[in-house]
Amino acid sequence: MEPIEQQLTELRTTLRHHEYLYHVMDAPEIPDAEYDRLMRELRELEAQRPDLITPDSPTQRVGAAPLTAFNQIRHEVPMLSLDNVFDEESFLAFNKRVQDRLKSTENVIWCCELKLDGLAVSILYENGVLVSAATRGDGTTGEDITSNVRTIRAIPLKLHGDNIPARLEVRGEVFLPQAGFEKINEDARRTGGKVFANPRNAAAGSLRQLDPRITAKRPLTFFCYGVGILEGGELPDTHLGRLLQFKAWGLPVSDRVTLCDSPQAVLDFYRNVEKDRPTLGFDIDGVVIKVNSLALQEQLGFVARAPRWAVAFKFPAQEQMTFVRDVEFQVGRTGAITPVARLEPVQVAGVLVSNATLHNADEIERLGLRIGDKVVIRRAGDVIPQVVNVVLSERPEETRPIVFPTHCPVCGSDVERVEGEAVTRCTGGLICGAQRKESLKHFVSRRAMDVDGMGDKIIDQLVEREYVHTPADLFRLTAGKLTGLDRMGPKSAQNVVNALEKAKATTFARFLYALGIREVGEATAAGLAAYFGTLEALQAATIDELQKVPDVGIVVATHVFNFFAEESNRDVIGQLLAEGVHWPAPVVINVQEIDSPFAGKTVVLTGSLSQMSRDDAKARLVALGAKVAGSVSKKTDLVIAGEAAGSKLAKAQELGITVIDEAEMIRLLDA
């Protein structure tokens, strides 16, 4: 090794060591000036020998040339969100649900952490070297922010220590400390730049810069809180153990992590953090509470898009006072008419609020609200502004009552309020432009029919120009007709037509969800599809039969029954099928009468499938008598591993469960 190579290696090792002490251990050994001197020395040596620069060198954080757009990264393991609770009663109910599902009367050991108010990211290390990073995005696909993440000094470009997995994807939060936020805004005011409303917006704006050199100038930091992909290595079997292992490898972890052995201990942690919140130096909006045992997490599983073993306990939202200048009425997808207060703009929790939901007529009556009133505004969950109460002692003389419409403000149809419901609805159905727009936007959305490129503005124009009345009309659109829309050229129009054609191939569950039946979300649609198997069987089902589907009660069953009883709905479904919308047909077989390797088996899918979608695979497996589970356990009979299979594959191998690949699955399906 040349002398300069030895110098470079020693300098990089020294700098990484001090980065670890500063960002992870919070115990710097040297002044910032000494760190800067070492960095300058490294830069000078690398300038002499650029052929010896390595990708994981501390100098390589500054970033490359600006990007023109962000590429997309598909999360191999979805980045799920958490359910929220906002008070002690709700948390205790969550705790009881967990105990009931575990069939245990013993206290659960909870791992409690801060809920950081930043931007969720995933970072992939291969053999300990940072290779990619992405935003959460929609949970399935995020933006490639690798170049920007490399500029954040708290994030190691190379992990250190022993037993580092071959592939390790860590999840965490990028955020901006309060001091850094104030400095950014101070500089912006001085130079005439953009002033951010709050640290979270500043962090998101900094991380999503197309020019990494701008990101490098922002004092972003990072805390790690979870794992996605894990291949070629092992992690401890508790959440806290994993956090400690991450810290040992050089990843920053919050020091406010506590194990709690009772619900009361969790509440004490929550109250202590809430008390300390103003002095933390960075924004949080609650605490995150997770079952510490990975085995129990696996046993609890997931519901829809959130784990059953974790919850975010949010702090009470910040409140401000302002005036209601007017009330307008919006019409939603199902005809629900929602009153919205137009406010004198006011800053609430760092965000300028000018509108607030009033929910329904009962809420207006409860508040005793009049137009012109002074009100208290809260951001519920720090997201949706709402009116908390009227400041009656300061009611102006000139206020006027809020009159709920007797006719739809959009189409003029009669409105009705069903006895026992709080919501007033427009009776116009799809003749109502507002309902038509919202229904069509739902129909083409990513988790429904997934029509790429069919955005809200296109739907608005299609409805306003009377080109489209029902979802079936979408599939009759031509490139020529679309070209006439604003900002829609021939190429874009053809892309939309192609996307519509592609969307015709769907799944029964997606199709049901896309129809927009009241109270039928993704999970319920999947349950209905799996239980009945065919559209014909579902349409013929009685209310009693519908209630046999897991998680379907009398209310949902009635909505589903009424939807299919409506002739106009059946007509639209018929038109959609006539236009070529289709999904894999289930083969209804008596499990006891067939010789299928899947019959009666509990099967788990993991990794990415290339020959068919995961939904298609599930549908075909279920049709052959399999039960498709979401996690691997001792009860699992078979694991089907696609590309980039992760922890489920490792778990299956550990338990000695039979594993086959996608090609073998297809061979067996077609046998």
Swiss-Prot record:
Cofactor(s) in the UniProt record: Mg(2+); Mn(2+)
One Pfam family recorded for the sequence: DNA_ligase_aden
GO cellular component, one term: cytosol
Binding site for NAD(+): 32-36, 81-82, 113, 136, 173, 290, 314
Domain of life: Bacteria
Enzyme class: ligase
SMART domains: BRCT, HhH1, LIGANc
Positions contributing to Zn(2+) binding: 408, 411, 426, 432
Ranges of residues in domain BRCT: 593-671
PROSITE patterns for this protein: BRCT, DNA_LIGASE_N1, DNA_LIGASE_N2
Catalytic site positions: 115 (n6-amp-lysine intermediate)
Keywords from the UniProt entry: DNA damage, DNA repair, DNA replication, Ligase, Magnesium, Manganese, Metal-binding, NAD, Zinc
GO MF terms, alphabetically ordered: DNA binding; DNA ligase (NAD+) activity; metal ion binding
InterPro entries: BRCT_dom, BRCT_dom_sf, DisA/LigA_HHH, DNA_ligase, DNA_ligase_AS, DNA_ligase_CS, DNAligase_adenylation, DNAligase_N
Record's catalysed reaction(s): NAD(+) + (deoxyribonucleotide)n-3'-hydroxyl + 5'-phospho-(deoxyribonucleotide)m = (deoxyribonucleotide)n+m + AMP + beta-nicotinamide D-nucleotide
Protein's UniProt keywords contain Manganese: yes
EC identifiers of the protein: 6.5.1.2
GO biological process: DNA repair; DNA replication
Family matches, as CDD domains: BRCT_DNA_ligase_like (cd17748), LIGANc (cd00114)
Record-linked Gene3D superfamilies: 5' to 3' exonuclease, C-terminal subdomain, 6.20.10.30, BRCT domain, DNA ligase/mRNA capping enzyme, Helix hairpin bin, Nucleic acid-binding proteins
Recorded family membership: Belongs to the NAD-dependent DNA ligase family. LigA subfamily.
PANTHER family, per the entry: CHROMOSOME TRANSMISSION FIDELITY FACTOR 18, DNA LIGASE
Function recorded in the entry: DNA ligase that catalyzes the formation of phosphodiester linkages between 5'-phosphoryl and 3'-hydroxyl groups in double-stranded DNA using NAD as a coenzyme and as the energy source for the reaction. It is essential for DNA replication and repair of damaged DNA.
UniProt-recorded name of the protein: DNA ligase
Gene expressing this chain: ligA
